Structure formats: structure tokens, C-alpha cells
Amino acid sequence: MKETIVAQATAPGRGGIGILRVSGPLATEVAQAILGKCPKPRMADYLPFKDADGTILDQGIALYFKSPNSFTGEDVLELQGHGGQVVLDLLLKRILQIDGIRLARPGEFSEQAFLNDKLDLAQAEAIADLIDATSEQAARSALKSLQGEFSKKVNELVDSVIYLRTYVEASIDFPDEEIDFLADGKIEANLRGIINQLENVRSEAKQGSILREGMKVVIAGRPNAGKSSLLNALAGREAAIVTDIAGTTRDVLREHIHIDGMPLHIIDTAGLRDATDEVERIGISRAWTEIEQADRIILMLDSSDPESADLSKVRSEFLAKLPSTLPVTIVRNKIDLNGEQASESEEGGYQIISLSAQTHDGVKLLREHLKQAMGFQTGIEGGFLARRRHLDALEKAAEHLQIGLVQLTEFHAGELLAEELRLVQSYLSEITGQFTSDDLLGNIFSSFCIGK
């Protein structure tokens, strides 16, 4: 027999309304014990909530949803009372006294909904993403994922792959047919169509991933180059202390900002130099740790100091120490001191933004550059939120499609193409949970709130 679970569905603490949710075969028994009756399905009933001895603990609205017409697909009872934590704890304690009822694990209601085919895995993840959204655009995109926009695109890809697999395997199973299915051009055309279709989904998923997770941008450079001033300019407030004393910033400072809906984690670091002060040396060590973990580096140069702004010197002292795959934007700061105009240029393969963090002249150029460099497009309609695991699955599927194309066009190997298509189908199906390990499910749902 399936277990019956209970948890507080609203956030802990004081509030106007507090909700307890019960899901499982004993939901009607809980209703009888607490309410004295089971409400009619999907009909709100205003009733007292009673303790075991008949004492009224609270009064409020009771809602009953009969299986399978509920969020979890099981019998569900919701008790909506006052939001005082003491009252809710008393009611929860009373429900847990009933035999066969236990406290729900984090995310267990959503997990039951997934296991009962009420929503797929991408939709279940979207519940947590909607709750955690930090911007209006992220919230709208999470809602679209919850409504199945992302899953629909993935399922369309899976259907296309299954159709092509069937066609390829038919050509393998009937080799004596006069028509050479592998050579008639239809399979290659379909395969290239799937590759293009997947590339469109990957592009949209990348934007969705930026919306969900943000991008980590580290501001680095020599002491007194204006790193903290730039952090303040981007944040729109005095987030960091700014002085003329080199080495003022000795630890890592973090700010979370949005540029037209794109979330950025901006990190200001200690100035990079050979320091003798132990505290400053620790700060510089932490700065290099942050640099190695960044999605992009903003390298600050002092344009008023010719030696500091010498790109050839910067290349040997700093750029040569970075991973070759780490994107770098060079910012020439303090143009207000030498009368330069704000501008964007390119030199030695690096984008260079000339600006003044003090007067904010050119800061808008940097904001636009960061948006473009991160591949973020403002105002895209119909977007969805995506997680890192989704991007990984899409990337692996794309790799195996390309391998399959080579097997077809260069080696005419139908069996090997069929195997690559099987792997593509498997990776895509992981996104929606059609092929998913128990460990992955545990990791996903354990990150949810209790009561969700």
C-alpha cells in the first residue's frame, strides 16, 4: 500500500494563511479525524480543525481532491488555516498521530506527481525554478517550462529521432530490397533536419540557463585600477569601498545584478600584485581562485597610466596565466582623466571597452557588450528555463547526431547510425524523465522545499 504523507505547503513563519497538504490513500481518514467528515471533491468547505479530544485547534477552509484529479495524482486533502506557526505545528502534530501518516520529504509531493505521470521531470524542476526566480523574465520562463513548453520541444525531437530510427532499422532488417534506403537521400535529409531542430532548442536552452543560473563575471586587475568603482557603477549603489589607496579591497566582494533581465554575479577581487602583507596575499590568492571559476573576466586597466595600460605587458603578466578557453573583456578605465571618449574596439583578439567608472561614461557600452558576449537576447518570447543537466543532455545528443551523420555519409554504416540514434533518444529522454536513474531523481527532488 502506498504511504500517506503530510507537510506544510506554505513557507514557515508568521503569515496570514498557512496550508497543510496531505497526499495518499489515507487522506479521507485524515479528513474524518480532523474535520469530522470528508468534503465533497473540489468543493471548499469552511470547518473547524479538531484535536484528538475534540478541542478546536483552528478553523478554515478544507479542500479535497480525489485521485487521479489532483496535483500528485493521489487523494489530496488541503487544510487552509491561519498562518501562525504554533497553530500549524499543533495541527501537523495531530495529523502525524494518525497511524500510517508520515512527514513528507523535501519535494516529495512533486516527486509523486512525476511518478504518477501528472507532470514530467522538466516540469517538476520548473516548480522549484519558479519559486526561486530572481527576475520577472525568469519567472515567466519558468512558468512556460511548467506549462510544458520545453518538454514539448524535447518530445518533438524524440519523435523525430524515433521515426528516423525506425526507417534506418528497416533498411538494415530488409537488406534484400531493391531500394537502398541508406543511399536514397531521405535519411540524410531527415538527419540534418533533426540536427538543425536540436540546434534551435540548444540556443533557446542556453538563454534559459542564463536566466536561471546567471553568469559569473570576475573583475580583476592591478590595485587602484578602478575595479571597485566599476562594481559600484554596475550595481547602481555603493557596494564597495573606494579610496585612492592601492589595495583597499582585500577580500572578494559579490553583487547580484540584472542587465535587461540577464542575471549576473559580479565579483570584485583584490588587486593583483606581489604583496608583502599577509592579509593582502590571502585576498590575491582568493582572487585567482575566483578567476579560474569565472564565466568571463573583466580585466581592468588604468588608461591614465601608460605602463599599466600596455597590452603587451598585460598579456605576459596576466593573460598568459589564464586558461585559453576563458573569455576576457578588457576595460580601459579612467578615460575622464585623459579626455578620451567612451568607445568599444578590438585589439589582439580582445574586446576593449574604454570608459570611466567614476563618471559612468561608457558603462552602458559595457552592459551591452556583456549581454552580447553571454549570448543573451532581450525580450525573446516563448522562452523556457533550462538547467545545466538539460544543456549537458542536449550537447551529448548533438555530438551523437554528428557522429551518426559521419557514419552515414562517409561509411554508409546503417547499424552504427542506428546505435547513435538510440543514444540520442536516450539523452533527450533524460530531460523529461522517460529514462532516468533513481539517483538523479533523488538529487533533483531533495533540493525542493518541504511541502512542494
UniProtKB/Swiss-Prot annotation:
<dbReference type="Pfam" id="PF01926">
    <property type="entry name" value="MMR_HSR1"/>
</dbReference>
<feature type="binding site">
    <location>
        <position position="21"/>
    </location>
    <ligand>
        <name>(6S)-5-formyl-5,6,7,8-tetrahydrofolate</name>
    </ligand>
</feature>
<dbReference type="InterPro" id="IPR031168">
    <property type="entry name" value="G_TrmE"/>
</dbReference>
<feature type="binding site">
    <location>
        <position position="224"/>
    </location>
    <ligand>
        <name>K(+)</name>
    </ligand>
</feature>
<dbReference type="GO" id="GO:0005525">
    <property type="term" value="F:GTP binding"/>
</dbReference>
<keyword id="KW-0819">tRNA processing</keyword>
<dbReference type="InterPro" id="IPR027368">
    <property type="entry name" value="MnmE_dom2"/>
</dbReference>
<dbReference type="InterPro" id="IPR006073">
    <property type="entry name" value="GTP-bd"/>
</dbReference>
<feature type="binding site">
    <location>
        <begin position="268"/>
        <end position="271"/>
    </location>
    <ligand>
        <name>GTP</name>
    </ligand>
</feature>
<feature type="binding site">
    <location>
        <position position="245"/>
    </location>
    <ligand>
        <name>K(+)</name>
    </ligand>
</feature>
<dbReference type="GO" id="GO:0030488">
    <property type="term" value="P:tRNA methylation"/>
</dbReference>
<keyword id="KW-0378">Hydrolase</keyword>
<feature type="binding site">
    <location>
        <position position="249"/>
    </location>
    <ligand>
        <name>Mg(2+)</name>
    </ligand>
</feature>
<feature type="binding site">
    <location>
        <begin position="243"/>
        <end position="249"/>
    </location>
    <ligand>
        <name>GTP</name>
    </ligand>
</feature>
<keyword id="KW-0479">Metal-binding</keyword>
<dbReference type="GO" id="GO:0003924">
    <property type="term" value="F:GTPase activity"/>
</dbReference>
<feature type="binding site">
    <location>
        <position position="248"/>
    </location>
    <ligand>
        <name>K(+)</name>
    </ligand>
</feature>
<keyword id="KW-0547">Nucleotide-binding</keyword>
<dbReference type="InterPro" id="IPR005225">
    <property type="entry name" value="Small_GTP-bd"/>
</dbReference>
<dbReference type="InterPro" id="IPR027266">
    <property type="entry name" value="TrmE/GcvT_dom1"/>
</dbReference>
<comment type="subunit">
    <text>Homodimer. Heterotetramer of two MnmE and two MnmG subunits.</text>
</comment>
<feature type="binding site">
    <location>
        <begin position="224"/>
        <end position="229"/>
    </location>
    <ligand>
        <name>GTP</name>
    </ligand>
</feature>
<feature type="binding site">
    <location>
        <position position="243"/>
    </location>
    <ligand>
        <name>K(+)</name>
    </ligand>
</feature>
<dbReference type="InterPro" id="IPR018948">
    <property type="entry name" value="GTP-bd_TrmE_N"/>
</dbReference>
<dbReference type="GO" id="GO:0046872">
    <property type="term" value="F:metal ion binding"/>
</dbReference>
<dbReference type="InterPro" id="IPR004520">
    <property type="entry name" value="GTPase_MnmE"/>
</dbReference>
<dbReference type="GO" id="GO:0005829">
    <property type="term" value="C:cytosol"/>
</dbReference>
<feature type="binding site">
    <location>
        <position position="118"/>
    </location>
    <ligand>
        <name>(6S)-5-formyl-5,6,7,8-tetrahydrofolate</name>
    </ligand>
</feature>
<keyword id="KW-0342">GTP-binding</keyword>
<dbReference type="Pfam" id="PF10396">
    <property type="entry name" value="TrmE_N"/>
</dbReference>
<dbReference type="Pfam" id="PF12631">
    <property type="entry name" value="MnmE_helical"/>
</dbReference>
<keyword id="KW-0963">Cytoplasm</keyword>
<dbReference type="InterPro" id="IPR027417">
    <property type="entry name" value="P-loop_NTPase"/>
</dbReference>
<feature type="binding site">
    <location>
        <position position="78"/>
    </location>
    <ligand>
        <name>(6S)-5-formyl-5,6,7,8-tetrahydrofolate</name>
    </ligand>
</feature>
<dbReference type="InterPro" id="IPR025867">
    <property type="entry name" value="MnmE_helical"/>
</dbReference>
<feature type="domain" description="TrmE-type G">
    <location>
        <begin position="214"/>
        <end position="375"/>
    </location>
</feature>
<comment type="function">
    <text>Exhibits a very high intrinsic GTPase hydrolysis rate. Involved in the addition of a carboxymethylaminomethyl (cmnm) group at the wobble position (U34) of certain tRNAs, forming tRNA-cmnm(5)s(2)U34.</text>
</comment>
<feature type="binding site">
    <location>
        <position position="452"/>
    </location>
    <ligand>
        <name>(6S)-5-formyl-5,6,7,8-tetrahydrofolate</name>
    </ligand>
</feature>
<keyword id="KW-0460">Magnesium</keyword>
<comment type="similarity">
    <text>Belongs to the TRAFAC class TrmE-Era-EngA-EngB-Septin-like GTPase superfamily. TrmE GTPase family.</text>
</comment>
<feature type="binding site">
    <location>
        <position position="228"/>
    </location>
    <ligand>
        <name>Mg(2+)</name>
    </ligand>
</feature>
<dbReference type="GO" id="GO:0002098">
    <property type="term" value="P:tRNA wobble uridine modification"/>
</dbReference>
